[in-house]
């Protein structure tokens, strides 16, 4: 069979077809391939099934390389694509779309807008006025499916193969060579899957179905344009036999900031030597027979998330920095760190990190950064490009950061979801304080549908079937972004009323990362759990109330 290319197409209902375009014969050779484990409406509508076979969350590494083999291969570019109005409707003919990108934004450029258009609603849900649904139910008539397909060639020296979807709106299922790989919700955090058992040497076929609405859509009622698609980069990656799975950089200071203690808590799979170089100092340790990996707080177990465990070993390195150059928006000092993994003296993997040293705390009624009062002069920022929607280029992100700095803005709230990691990297480097916000907003359940705050409508409240789905979103964000010095505050989300689950989220943040504060504006609306937020804020305050407060 000739080399598979973007002209290869796959998957029809429960079955898969590979069409290999023969340039010389100008025709298609069709190979039938059954597709196992089709996604059902019941799965999409179940709030307790929000991920299947998704790997444990971990820190984002901007710089991870190996001299032996390429660790990451980008799948960005043109993909084969087709579209259906719902799970039972017929698919369109095959077309091509660009990844990353939104289906509806690209549909605008095609005659007749065949894949729909962006849809703006504020506090309502996008199905309001079309179908009457209760929380967890999903539209039956209009719930479009975007089916993406492309081929890839497995590098000869890869012993393992993983897939990373950096952003899929709002749910995605993955197959490789017709074999079901996994399922994910939570639009704005990465989902990783192990495809090693499904791939084979040479050419492979990858299929991703993206569903516009799922049960998680009830948790994503942000005031923005509603769209769907693979809107952030898609990557394949492999892991060397000795691999850094995760790292959490922690720090503490002498009371007068004359010295800092910096600890690198690493999780490593495989056996060999782990070496950390930081501030001109080097430490190393041997790792041998690994212990079973426990990712700590685990949400979505059982059917929703089968045990996905890696054999890893914990190892920590602690350094002392005398007279540290502290990080702030005015002076965003960054130290470089390198974590090298070696076996018998040969370098297996290198990970570079930039570390900002700062202490953020609440004393009395004041927030202090490095012992001094801090005032946020900030903005709420949606990810947005007028041409591509929430698929924002690196050039556009840099333009945003430079213009914010030029206008004396020093803080950004990632309203109302985790931003692209590159934007956070820029905030580290240029100096912007960040409130990292969980991908959670249920405005339409409590303000429009459940105005009395009843449990029948309001999400998440204390409803047990939604608890793990909500808490997993907090975990995914924290684990990905925990090493960014720019992030000073974790946010529990936006306009989701109140209740026990939000309080549990705030406690998870404090327990896992006591170096940051926790914010949730919604305690102003629901005082049942006031400890959910470390500080109180209020949106849309009338001018008269502000004058009264300042008097």
Task: Name each model-derived stretch.
Residues 199-203, 265-361:
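Extended acidic/polar, glycine-enriched regions
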Residues 32-39, 44-51, 62-66, 80-84, ...:
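Accessory beta-strand-rich segments of carbohydrate-active enzymes
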Residues 10, 17-21, 26-29:
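Short, positively charged and aromatic/hydrophobic N-terminal segments
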